[in-house]
A protein has these predicted regions:
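Active-site capping/gating regions of soluble enzymes
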Residues: 148, 156-158, 166-173
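A mid-sequence, solvent-exposed acidic-amphipathic segment
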Residues: 167-185
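Catalytic alpha-helical scaffold of carbohydrate-active enzymes acting on polysaccharides/glycoconjugates
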Residues: 1-155, 161, 179-251
């Protein structure tokens, strides 16, 4: 089972360049990137999970409704928010969509403990790893889903074939033919599932220097990511690897 998910989040602009990029522009980038993802998924009849960054929840009600309308799951993404802010965002999404929000994903450096997450009435926590060129420093340690304080913990997935994580950076940088081999090796092995996550901003061209992206992060953005995602979904379909929303697989 492939658990494909997307972080609905704006690109993180360096502090020295923040005055060059308006909040409206960042929201537009996030909206456009997410809309492109939804369109690609719809063409392939695939349903996924979208984790929306806390600060964007109130600013993008139409997008959240569209995600739900298209049959996808909505979760909360904690980049650096307090417990109160997360609870408020969760409530807004639930009232807006009429759907219970089961899952949360958190940036590693600002992660609330499992008992706090459970207190916020989440059912599962989807882990993520730093998405940069230094992930090679991490020792490969395969983990499976487990419970902690009655909260389902879903670890990030790594390929036993390449020792690379299935994160946004790997999908962006690795040639698709090699990525397919990673998937085949994992799925034909003893992996019950693979969690893959990408970012909405990766589906928008961000070549301007004002966004402060390192050169390797500008590679394959925008239309190239759209095409790559479409070809990847076609590969999954032809290989008969199922894709599902996270809440449907674990509950």
């Amino acid at each position: 089972m492939v658990l494909l998910s997307f972080n609905v989040i704006a690109p993180e602009v360096p502090i020295k360049d923040k005055h060059l990029v308006s909040e409206e522009e960042l929201i537009k980038i996030t909206f456009n990137g997410t809309k492109k993802i939804i369109d690609v998924l719809e063409k392939h009849f695939v349903f996924c999970t979208f984790f929306v960054e806390v600060s964007l929840v109130e600013k993008m009600p139409e997008l959240l409704q569209l995600i739900t309308k298209k049959g996808h799951e909505l979760g909360i993404l904690n980049q650096h928010s307090t417990e109160e802010e997360i609870v408020s965002a969760k409530k807004i999404v639930e009232e807006l969509t009429g759907k219970f929000v089961s899952g949360i994903r958190q940036f590693p450096q600002f992660k609330h403990k499992s008992d706090v997450v459970k207190r916020m009435k989440f059912s599962y926590h989807s882990s993520m790893y730093f998405s940069n060129i230094f992930w090679l420093n991490k020792d490969f340690d395969k983990k499976t889903v487990y419970e902690e304080n009655e909260l389902v913990i879903v670890p990030d997935s790594w390929s036993p074939y390449s020792k690379l994580p299935y994160n946004d950076f790997t999908f962006q940088m690795i040639p698709l033919f090699f990525y397919k081999n990673m998937i085949n090796n994992s799925m034909k092995g003893d992996d019950e599932y693979i969690v893959i996550y990408l970012n909405s901003w990766q589906f928008v061209e961000l070549n301007h220097s004002k966004f402060g992206l390192p050169f390797y992060r500008k590679y394959n953005l925008g239309r190239q990511m759209e095409d790559k995602l479409g070809r990847f979904l076609l590969f999954l379909e032809e290989s008969e690897w199922a894709v599902n929303r996270m809440k449907d697989f674990f509950f």
